[in-house]
Amino acid sequence: MIIPLLPWYVFTMICEMGARGVLAVVLGSGFKIILTGVILTVLYLVIQYCIAGAIAGKNPFKCIWNMLPAYFTAFSICSSSAAIPVTSDCTRKNGIPDDIVDFTIPLCSTVHMCGSTIKLAVSAIAVAYLTGTPLPFAVYIHFVLMQGIAAVAAPGVMGGVLMASIGLLESIMGFSPDQTALVMTLYLALDGYGPACNVTGDGAIALIINKFFGKKQTPSVQ
């Protein structure tokens, strides 16, 4: 009921801030903020797959290549849950058997929100600096840790992590309604790369799960 109305709320807040001249301060740096988020999510995936590849004994970059259809599907539809069929097919190409895929991918689509968490953290920290309210480093760490917990309970749909973390923006970061609306604007400006990172990372988790709990004889990476 709430999430479909979120764009309208953000739109009204943007209009009000635009009339007061606040919006231009943040959106002037919007491209840099989004680019920073994209770079961090890609770096996260490379590290994640290097670790998973070392554990599973597979080429991490070949595994990432096999997961690209899932990445671009989630990027286009902005949803981890809706991309489950494509993510499952891509994970099988990495040599993961059906029983591991059918357990890991649906579960991770609702609890593994790494990309969305990174994106929201970047947006929140950027807004804090751009609005002249930088906070101690310990506050950022506290926010990121609590946000990671909140993301586990968030639905795998567009804006799910954002809605689950609004209370943290106000209670931990001390954001005003205007600052919270700016975070929403940056978060939703290019929502796709968060879910894209989420589903691609699910494949790395499947590699690790298969190593410890899968059958010894598994198909090779295609």
Where are these regions (language model features)?
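Hydrophobic/aromatic residues in alpha-helical transmembrane segments
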Residues: 7, 11, 47-48, 87, ...
